[in-house]
Curated annotation (Swiss-Prot):
EC number(s) stated in the UniProt entry for this protein: 6.1.1.22
Similarity comment: Belongs to the class-II aminoacyl-tRNA synthetase family.
Keywords for the protein's UniProt record, in alphabetical order: Aminoacyl-tRNA synthetase, ATP-binding, Cytoplasm, Ligase, Nucleotide-binding, Protein biosynthesis
Lineage per the UniProt record: Bacteria, Bacillati, Cyanobacteriota, Cyanophyceae, Synechococcales
Protein name, entry field: Asparagine--tRNA ligase
Top-level EC class as recorded in UniProt: ligase
Subunit structure: Homodimer.
Organism per entry: Synechocystis sp. (strain ATCC 27184 / PCC 6803 / Kazusa)
GO biological process assignments: asparaginyl-tRNA aminoacylation
Length: 462
């Protein structure tokens, strides 16, 4: 028997094909001499309609056990479907119940469940239409990311999850230790980390950028794609404690090249997902956010807007809209400012460059004016910042000065400074929050619903 995924059957199956499908029952409808059941195997949004004839072996017993959530194996012959919505249906010649589901306790019944409720049953929510569609789009996004960089000769590098440095300087780090918390060793300065596993204080990484720079200065173009962590006590729809980051790093590249790479990258991802997940994207447009497809089209077919931070401040100061946070040169843009620029002023993704040096990280290249750095943020409608990047400071003396200004210990990053001593070149990179792009693409309101197992304050279930 030809084992097939349901998406293959629905797209390519022909009448009289003998097939076997495996999946989970979504709905059952019983008539006098036969029944209809809808089966889903996770490969597509659509279910496959299976026709069970009353003459099927053990029909009555099987029918009584076929409840929503039950796992099935069905064999039979495809036939043209007289109903609307799909070309073929499966007329069963054999049905096997692999695992039942008690209708009295199975929480996913044929009704609409809130996303808040679904988060409490994270082990079952992938079986719902919406979360299933999110995960297929997430998979397509990840595939697109790798394909984009691999087609362009980038090397995928694996940077450490455990680190001794705070790349971003934010301070919201998860500490890693094997010390006995009941008997913590002390010295004159406090905890004696020399007795810890690594002989020094260690953390979960917030970024693989610094290590990616190491690799870029050997292999030219590289990218990282992996989990990052931030112990920021934020219970909002935009924050996760564990999230995935994509961080390309390009040697012999300046801010203009960085901007071009980032724009091409975003357009590629959206185009790829629209081609690979058309039914899922249509679902999001109809059920979640009716601007999803228009937003994708806007990104793919329009040049991104581009202006400096100073120009952005002038536009915001002249805005008719009242902002919660004041606008002033030297103050970082808030989400409301970013969204105003992308949604109201330019109505498309917007790239803001050349931020004040005092609000950006030490590794960003100082511009000739001595006040700004060669940084960029890409702002997306409804989301705000979706990509942050910069040309890196390749000049040893200026990098050292910037570290001193920001209180970054040189001894902790001696190896990073060495990169500027031996064969230093202009280089640049950017970071994309993976969940942010999935959220932006699907229109999902809460970032906790675009990752399989969200990690947030007071929540590490499943």
């Amino acid at each position: 028997m030809n084992k097939r995924r349901i998406i293959e059957v629905l797209r390519h199956g022909q009448a009289d094909d003998q097939v076997m499908v495996q999946g989970w029952l979504r709905t059952k409808r019983t008539l006098k001499d036969f029944s209809f059941v809808e089966v889903n195997d996770g490969s597509s949004l659509a279910n496959l309609q299976v026709v069970l004839d009353g003459s099927l072996a053990d029909y009555d017993r099987l029918l009584s056990q076929l409840q929503t959530g039950a796992a099935l194996v069905v064999e039979g012959k495809l036939a043209p479907s007289p109903g609307k919505g799909q070309r073929v249906e499966l007329k069963a010649t054999k049905l096997e119940l692999l695992g039942g589901a008690d209708p009295g306790s199975y929480p996913l019944q044929k009704k609409r469940h809130s996303f808040e409720f679904l988060r409490t049953i994270g082990h079952l929510r992938p079986r719902t239409n919406t979360i299933g569609a999110v995960m297929r789009v997430r998979n397509a996004c990840a595939t697109a990311i790798h394909q984009f960089f691999q087609e362009r000769g980038f090397l995928w590098v694996h940077t450490p999850i455990i680190t001794a440095s705070d790349c971003e300087g934010a301070g919201d780090l998860f500490k890693v230790t094997t010390l006995d918390l009941q008997r913590v060793p002390k010295n004159g300065e406090g905890i004696d980390y020399s007795q810890d596993f690594f002989g020094k204080q260690a953390y979960l990484t917030v970024s693989g950028q610094l290590e990616a720079e190491v690799m870029a200065l050997a292999f030219q173009n590289v990218y990282t794609f992996g989990p990052t962590f931030r112990a920021e006590n934020s219970n909002t729809s935009r924050h996760l404690a564990e999230f995935w980051m994509v961080e390309p790093e390009m040697a012999f590249c300046d801010l203009e090249g960085d901007r071009q790479w980032a724009e091409e990258f975003l357009k590629y991802i959206f185009k790829f997902v629209l081609e690979k997940c058309p039914e899922d994207m249509e679902f999001f447009d109809q059920r979640i956010d009716n601007t999803v497809l228009a937003t994708a089209d806007n990104i793919i077919n329009n040049e991104f807007a581009w202006l400096t931070y100073s120009e952005a401040i002038k536009l915001l100061e002249k805005a008719d809209q009242k902002f919660e946070y004041p606008v002033a040169w030297g103050v970082d843009l808030q989400s409301e400012h970013e969204r105003y620029l992308a949604e109201t002023v330019f109505k498309r993704p917007t790239i803001v460059t050349d931020y004040p040096k005092d609000i950006k990280a030490f590794y960003m290249r100082l511009n000739d004016d001595g006040k700004t750095v060669a940084a960029m943020d890409i702002l997306a409608p409804k989301i705000g910042e979706i990509i942050g990047g910069s040309q890196r400071e390749e000049r040893l003396d200026i990098l050292t000065q910037r570290m001193q200004e920001q209180g970054v210990p040189e001894e902790d990053l001696w190896w990073y400074l060495d990169l500027r001593r031996y064969g230093s070149v202009p280089h640049a990179g950017f970071g994309l929050g993976f969940e942010r792009i999935v959220q932006f693409m699907t229109g999902m309101a809460n970032i906790r619903d675009v990752i399989p197992f969200p990690r947030t304050p007071m929540n590490a279930e499943f």
